[in-house]
Amino acid sequence: MERAIFAGGCFWCMVQPFEEQDGILSVRSGYTGGHVVNPTYEQVCSKMTGHTEAVEIIFDESKISYADLVEIYWRQTDPTDSFGQFEDRGDNYRPVIFYFDEQQRKIAEQSKANLQASGHFNRPIVTTIEAAQPFYEAEKDHQAFYRKNPERYARSSAIRHHFLKENWS
């Protein structure tokens, strides 16, 4: 089993696209990249901990590759926006691909370079690629939010879904 961590704005919106893939064993919402041990949602939202909302994915590489996950990741984000994603603004919503080893780093860097070279966007691809740091699972009510609260999820992700349809369909 392998592990991946991606930050792409509100973690509620990052779970479903990965969870629906064959070979995904689990997707957990949480926090990473900060200086407080085991932060709460309120602490992270205060922008005082340095964490970003992210998802941790455990996957079976015999069924889905890390490169596949990176491609899925791009299609959930606006990779030209470094100060949050869609309606969620600030460092705690910044787009980041976290890597666990040199192979993951190389895959992410090459994928980013390919996206930039494709001309798909007319602005620079600013998503950062950083070494993984401790991941802290978010509170239970944030896990699988899209299933537990479909109406609230739909309202909170409308701008994101419009962008994704316009730019990635």
Swiss-Prot record:
InterPro entries: Met_Sox_Rdtase_MsrA_dom (IPR002569), Met_Sox_Rdtase_MsrA_sf (IPR036509). Gene3D superfamilies: Peptide methionine sulphoxide reductase MsrA. Its EC number is 1.8.4.11. It catalyses: L-methionyl-[protein] + [thioredoxin]-disulfide + H2O = L-methionyl-(S)-S-oxide-[protein] + [thioredoxin]-dithiol; [thioredoxin]-disulfide + L-methionine + H2O = L-methionine (S)-S-oxide + [thioredoxin]-dithiol. GO terms for biological process: protein modification process. The keyword Aminoacyl-tRNA synthetase does not apply. Pfam families: PMSR. The active site is at C10. The keyword Chloroplast does not apply. One of its GO terms (molecular function) is peptide-methionine (S)-S-oxide reductase activity. Keywords: Oxidoreductase. Belongs to the MsrA Met sulfoxide reductase family. HAMAP family: MsrA (MF_01401). Has an important function as a repair enzyme for proteins that have been inactivated by oxidation. Catalyzes the reversible oxidation-reduction of methionine sulfoxide in proteins to methionine. This is Peptide methionine sulfoxide reductase MsrA. The gene is msrA.
